[in-house]
From Swiss-Prot:
Protein name: Glycerol-1-phosphate dehydrogenase [NAD(P)+]
Organism whose genome encodes this protein: Nitrosopumilus maritimus (strain SCM1)
Reactions performed catalytically: sn-glycerol 1-phosphate + NAD(+) = dihydroxyacetone phosphate + NADH + H(+); sn-glycerol 1-phosphate + NADP(+) = dihydroxyacetone phosphate + NADPH + H(+)
Record-level GO BP terms: glycerophospholipid metabolic process; phospholipid biosynthetic process
EC numbers, comma separated: 1.1.1.261
EC top class named in words: oxidoreductase
Subunit structure: Homodimer.
Binding site for substrate: D130, D176, H259
Pfam families: Fe-ADH_2 (PF13685)
GO molecular function: glycerol-1-phosphate dehydrogenase (NAD+) activity; glycerol-1-phosphate dehydrogenase (NADP+) activity; metal ion binding
Function according to Swiss-Prot or TrEMBL: Catalyzes the NAD(P)H-dependent reduction of dihydroxyacetonephosphate (DHAP or glycerone phosphate) to glycerol 1-phosphate (G1P). The G1P thus generated is used as the glycerophosphate backbone of phospholipids in the cellular membranes of Archaea.
Cofactors that this protein relies on: Zn(2+)
């Protein structure tokens, strides 16, 4: 590898300025915004259920700090919905946007923030993936993978709210974290094969986030998931992507597999669930301990088979075959394997995914 090959292009590290993680602290949201930028008006983007549950407490906290607000409801992540909300937010003339809810609301706020050049804060009510602190957003469009938007200026988490969300969501977050060990291995491979930049620090940060699940899964199986640890690990994973300047530390072949399933079987399984199942198979291709991943996912209550999330054998096989074609510029272990129908079926069966 030449000196020039190993030299990366400069990139900007856009990081959250302030992250607050507390318990039963949603009534401090107004103070959080005030300390962050002293906004006069904030556009609040959330789903119908989240708005119904949190509206009273959030509005009270904003009024205490004399912050005006306008609510907007995000029903799906279709481009048409996003465009509608963006037009409404533009009319608000707010100086802050807040995404309050699951991945959809946070992603919507993130992309609108980027398009309108207005800072935004992430207020996750579920910990199902690492998007709460990353600059990447997933919307239904012609792009087969996440797109770059903007990192949140701040992240505000009430662990009590996270705990009240369905346990399946937290287990999905564990699946997204476990995927980091696949992504980092793929990133190392890409660096070796193409000379692309490899950020040791961001890779280690992503790995540390994954190990919080892998090393503690037996304890979680016995005592239940530790919501705070998992939330903080997901935030750290998102920050790792901010530092890397790309999704590389948290997104490898397992994410390509998940994106392929999004196209083949939309609506089947949560993002982290699909990444977890993908990690089992890709780990075997990489020569990693895939059985440990299976055990970890079972310990945290995440699915390990296609059937558990309503997928057929053919859908798993097809997703493995088309995964690498979705993002040909990203070097992963799938570049080393000419994935055929026979190979895909053998891989999925040998890992008991199908």
């Amino acid at each position: 590898m030449t000196k020039n090959q190993d030299r990366m292009k400069s990139h900007t590290m856009e990081l959250p300025r302030q992250i607050v993680v507390g318990e039963k602290n949603i009534n401090e949201f107004g103070e959080f915004l005030h300390n962050l930028t002293k906004p006069k008006k904030v556009s609040l983007i959330s789903g119908i259920h989240v708005k119904k549950v949190l509206r009273q407490r959030i509005e009270k906290s904003l009024k205490t700090k004399r912050i005006k607000f306008v609510w907007h409801t995000s029903k799906d992540n279709q481009i048409s919905t996003l465009n509608r909300i963006e037009k409404e937010v533009k009319k608000d003339r707010s100086d802050m946007i807040a995404g309050i809810g699951g991945g959809r609301s946070v992603d919507t706020a993130k992309l609108i923030s980027f398009n309108l050049d207005i800072p935004f804060v992430s207020v996750p009510t579920a910990a199902s993936h690492d998007g709460v602190s990353s600059p990447f957003v997933s919307v239904k469009s012609d792009k087969p993978h996440s797109i770059v938007a903007t990192a949140p200026l701040g992240v505000f988490v009430d662990i009590d709210i996270i705990k009240k969300a369905p346990s399946r969501l937290l287990a999905s977050g564990c699946g997204d974290l476990v995927a980091n060990i696949i992504a980092v291995k793929d990133w190392q491979l890409g660096h070796q094969k193409t000379g692309e930049y490899y950020g040791t620090y961001s890779a280690e940060l992503a790995m540390m986030s994954a190990m919080m699940v892998l090393d503690n899964s037996s304890k979680y199986a016995k005592n239940g998931l530790d919501a705070r640890v998992i939330v903080e690990a997901l935030i750290s994973a998102g920050v790792a992507s901010c530092i890397a300047g790309s999704s590389r530390p948290c997104s490898g072949a397992e994410h390509l597999f998940s994106h392929a399933l999004d196209k083949i079987a939309p609506g089947k399984g949560l993002h982290g669930e699909k990444c977890g199942i993908g990690s089992i198979m890709i780990a075997k291709l990489q020569g990693q301990d895939w059985k440990k991943i299976v055990k970890t996912l079972k310990d945290v209550g995440a699915p390990t088979t296609a059937k558990q999330i309503g997928l057929t054998e053919d859908q798993i096989i097809d997703a493995l075959i088309i995964a690498q074609d979705l993002r040909p510029e990203r070097y992963t272990i799938l570049k080393e394997v000419e994935m055929t129908d026979r190979k895909a079926k053998s891989l999925a069966k040998s890992t008991k995914v199908i």
